[in-house]
A protein has these predicted regions:
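GNAT-family acyltransferases
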Residues: 2-137, 150, 195-200, 204-210, ...
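Glycine-rich acyl-CoA binding loop
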Residues: 140
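Conserved GNAT acetyl-CoA-binding A-motif
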Residues: 153-163
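Conserved beta-strand-loop-alpha-helix junction that forms the acyl-donor binding cleft
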Residues: 162-171
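Conserved active-site tyrosine of GNAT-family acetyltransferases
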Residues: 174-175, 202
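Conserved catalytic-core motifs of GNAT/GCN5-like acyltransferases
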Residues: 181-195
Length: 239
């Protein structure tokens, strides 16, 4: 876990350390908007538009692993999955965005902004489902960049959180790669499908965003990929 010394100033009356002023203005709530990127587009989740594509991208004998650490197991049939997407699309918190692959025009995953706290300017990215066509592509990284940019630059949040099952090694590697700082483990934090879940907590702060933004944009630049579409430099190499 990264060591952290909180910024402080002395209280003028007691001399004891207190937090620095952060302002009392609230952040804005995320909206159902379209966020356009080079490789992917985020748009409000819609059961009519997105169910068929998402079902194909996330269901099949070779795709059970996609659901391993999510709250829901793989769905038994298309109708159940559509009802699931309808419920998610109607939610305001979490607020779901479909991830659209711009080359194919198909929905290949979804992600959310959740635990939305405009007063304290804290928000979380979660409920991330990447179908097999999205995994390990530039669009998978860009989908995260687009939400981060929206959160920090448009909505004005101070803290952006990532939480996952502590046993979910791929999610934890992704958090590290995307520039989140590991903050610790919440033991016996919740139960998922009647099993214990210890939760790993990560965050990016608004003061850290400019450096992370530079790294994302440099990595996503088409010049960072060869003619076979392979990266020339890793995202971590730009930090």
């Amino acid at each position: 876990m990264t060591s952290f010394t909180p910024a402080s100033v002395p209280d003028p009356h007691t001399g004891l350390p207190i937090g620095v002023e952060a302002g009392i203005h609230a952040a804005a709530r995320p909206e159902r908007i379209t966020i356009d990127g080079r490789y992917v587009r985020l748009e409000p989740l819609d059961a009519i538009k997105h169910t068929d594509d998402l079902y194909v991208a996330s269901h099949g004998d070779d795709k059970h692993v996609i659901w391993q650490y999510l709250f829901e197991p793989p769905f038994t049939d298309h109708a159940d999955f559509k009802a699931h997407i309808e419920r998610k699309a109607a939610s305001d918190d979490p607020l779901f965005y479909a991830i659209i692959d711009k080359a194919s025009g198909k929905a290949v995953g979804y992600e959310t902004l959740m635990r939305i706290d405009p007063t304290h300017r804290v928000i979380e990215v979660g409920n991330i489902m990447y179908g097999t066509p999205l995994q390990k592509t530039p669009g998978a990284t860009e989908a995260q960049y687009l939400l981060m940019r929206y959160v920090f630059e448009t909505l004005g949040y101070r803290r952006y959180e990532w939480k996952c099952n502590s046993l979910n090694a791929p999610s934890r590697r992704a958090a590290d790669r995307f520039g989140f700082t590991f903050e610790g483990i919440f033991r016996q934090h919740m139960m998922v499908r009647a099993r214990n879940r210890d939760t790993a907590w990560y965050s990016i702060l608004d003061t850290e965003w400019p450096k992370q933004k530079h790294a994302f944009e440099a990595w996503l630049d088409p010049r960072n990929f060869n003619s076979q579409g392979r990266q020339i430099k890793r995202l971590e190499d730009f930090k």
